[in-house]
Amino acid sequence: MHVIGLMSGTSVDGIDAALVEISGRELDLQVDLIAAQTYPYPDALRNQILAVCRGEPLSIEALAGLDDAIAMQFAQAAQSIQAEATLTAELIGSHGQTVFHRPPQGNLGYTLQIGRGAVIAHQTGINTVSNFRVADMAAGGQGAPLVSKLDICLLSHPEFYRCVQNIGGIGNVTYLPPLTDASQLGMGVKGWDTGPGNVLMDLAVAHFSKGELTYDADGAWAAQGNPCQPLIEEWLRHPFFQAPPPKSTGRELFSPDYLQTCLQTAASYQLSPADMLATLTDFTAATIVYNYDQFLPHPPDQVVLCGGGSRNGYLRQCLQQRLGGSTVLTTDDVGLNSDAKEAIAFAVLAYWQQLQIPGNVPAVTGASGPILLGELHLV
C-alpha cells in the first residue's frame, strides 16, 4: 500500500512528508521510502503556532482559523509529495501540529493537535487517519512517544542493545533489547521523552541573534564556546529529569520562560553567547545520557539518532563524549532516513489502523493496554 505520512513536531519548522510503500504486519513489516520532503511553514503561520505554544491567549475563532490554515498546509504537502513521486497514495497518516500537551498526573492527560484530518481527506481525495495520540491518553497513557513500535519493528538488532534517540524540538528515546524472534516482540522495550531536544538551543540562537537566526547549523556557533559544567549539573536537578518513565513533555515546560531562567542562573558566570550555546548543547546531551544512566536496565551498545538534532555535529560530539563506549550512529547508517523517520512512523500508524493493529506500546506510554490509534476520515 502506498501511504503518505505527514508530521510537524515541536520545532515547528515545517511539515515533513514521506510517501512510502508498506507491506507486512509487524516484525515482517516492509517500508520502502519513495519520496520525502520538508515543506517550511510560512513565517507568519509559524509565528502564530509558536505564540499558541507559548500560551498566549487566543480566541476560539482565531484557533479555528489556525486549524484551517494548518489543515490546508498539510493537504498541500500531501499533494506536493505525490506530484514529486508521480504516483497516487491510497492513505494518509497525518500527525497534525501539537499546540498543547498535558501529561497525565493522577488523572487523564490531554493533547491537542490541530490541522484536522477531515479537511486533508476532502482536499486530497485520499482517506486520512489523524488524531493519533488521544486514544492512548484516554487509556491512561502519555500519548507519547508513539514511534516506539516502528522502532521495534524496523530498528531492533539481534545482538545489540540499541537506544533510538529522536532529537526534534523535544527528545525521546526507544530502548530496544536484542530481538531474535517474534515471540520477543515488545519484551523489555522502554521509551519516554528525555527532555529538551533542539528547543532550548533554538530559542537561545533566536535570542542571541535578535531573531535573525532560528537554529545553530551543525552546532557551529556552540562549537566556538566552552560549556559550563556547574550550570549543567544545576539544571539537571529539575524534577522532570528525576522523574521515572513513563513521562512526556513539550514546549509547555521547555519554553521561553525556561530559557530565561537558564540565562538568569548563568548570569554570575559571565558567559559569552558562544559559551551559553555550548552549555545548552552539552546540557541537551547530558539530559539524554542522564536518562539512560538512571532508567535503563542495560547500557546501550549503539545510540541511533534521528530528527533535526542528528545533524548537529557539536551535539553529536557532546553525546559521544558523555556516552563513552556506546557507538553513536544515525538511522541513515542503519537504512532509515533520519529526516523522514517521524513522517514514516505516522504513515505506518495509519497503515496499522487500517489493519486493526494497535500502534502503541503500553510499556512505553503507560496506557492500560494495546490501543488502535487514529481516527479515520473517509472521502
Curated annotation (Swiss-Prot):
Stated family: Belongs to the anhydro-N-acetylmuramic acid kinase family.
Protein name: Anhydro-N-acetylmuramic acid kinase
Role of this protein: Catalyzes the specific phosphorylation of 1,6-anhydro-N-acetylmuramic acid (anhMurNAc) with the simultaneous cleavage of the 1,6-anhydro ring, generating MurNAc-6-P. Is required for the utilization of anhMurNAc either imported from the medium or derived from its own cell wall murein, and thus plays a role in cell wall recycling.
UniProt pathway annotation: Amino-sugar metabolism; 1,6-anhydro-N-acetylmuramate degradation; Cell wall biogenesis; peptidoglycan recycling
Source organism (scientific name): Acaryochloris marina (strain MBIC 11017)
Alphabetical list of SUPFAM superfamilies matching this protein: Actin-like ATPase domain (SSF53067)
Gene Ontology molecular function terms on file: ATP binding; kinase activity; phosphotransferase activity, alcohol group as acceptor
Gene3D superfamilies associated with the record: 3.30.420.40
Pfam families with a match to the protein in the record: AnmK (PF03702)
